Amino acid sequence: VIGGDECNINEHRFLALLYSERFQCGGTLINEEWVLTAAHCDMGNMYIYLGVHNVSVQYDDEQRRYPKKKYFCLSSRNYNQWDNDIMLIRLNRPVRNSAHIAPLSLPSGPPSVGSVCRVMGWGTITSPNETYPDVPHCANINILDYEVCRAAYAGLPATSRTLCAGILEGGKDSCRGDSGGPLICNGEIQGIVSWGGNICAQPREPGLYTKVFDYIDWIQSIIAGNTTVNCPP
């Protein structure tokens, strides 16, 4: 996260660190057995850490899991930059709530343009040169009109299941290594960090976030055991 500050240790109990030897992403615990992240975060030999703040410290209530099963949009195992960049992971066993671990609510409605939301992760805090922090950084950004992103990125369709979010004048943004992590509005997960400009936090180049509200039925169906459900068309 560019332009943010170290997150408060108590404000990210739902934040998961997805890690393999050469790759990291964020994720969000949405109940004791399920983590929501981005499809492009799929990696082999993935470990999922919960209850972590400083990655170089071992916490008493830290819990490590691995995926029992990963679910993608069946309508297309393919995702692209503006479609279906979402993955639901069933953990090999449930996690226990603790001082540093608790799930985040799914959205009760879509977010409105102008809302101030919070993005967080262990991604780089500088761009284009990368500097990875030991602790997650948090920044407040705005839900922007989708047209701002259409103006910034050639090829974005007229409508998509993504949110455009950032700061128009630049300076605050998610960045490399934050992928899959949450965009939180009013205590609910509204977005999943998906993609953005090659250099992060540039003016008029906001980030794009998978719009979680559009996938609620898909998420809830899979958790309920209906694994043949398709993503929204």
Curated annotation (Swiss-Prot):
Glycans are attached at residues 54, 129, 226. SUPFAM superfamilies: Trypsin-like serine proteases. It is found in: Secreted. The active site is at 40 (charge relay system), 85 (charge relay system), 179 (charge relay system). The record marks 77-78 as: Cleavage. The fibrinolytic activity is completely inhibited by PMSF, diisopropylfluorophosphate (DFP), pefabloc, dithiothreitol (DTT) and Zn(2+), but not by Pepstatin A, E64, iodoacetate, chymostatin, tosyl-Lphenylalanine chloromethyl ketone (TPCK), soybean trypsin inhibitor (SBTI), phosphoramidon, Ca(2+), Co(2+), Cu(2+), Fe(2+), Mg(2+), Mn(2+), K(+), and Na(+). Disulfide bonds join 7-138, 25-41, 73-231, 117-185, 149-164, 175-200. InterPro entries: Peptidase_S1_PA (IPR009003), Peptidase_S1_PA_chymotrypsin (IPR043504), Peptidase_S1A (IPR001314), Trypsin_dom (IPR001254), TRYPSIN_HIS (IPR018114), TRYPSIN_SER (IPR033116). It is an enzyme of class 3 (hydrolase). Keywords: Disulfide bond, Fibrinogenolytic toxin, Fibrinolytic toxin, Glycoprotein, Hemostasis impairing toxin, Hydrolase, Protease, Secreted, Serine protease, Toxin. Residues 1-224 form the Peptidase S1 domain. It comes from the Eukaryota. Belongs to the peptidase S1 family. Snake venom subfamily. This is Beta-fibrinogenase brevinase. It comes from Gloydius blomhoffii (Mamushi).
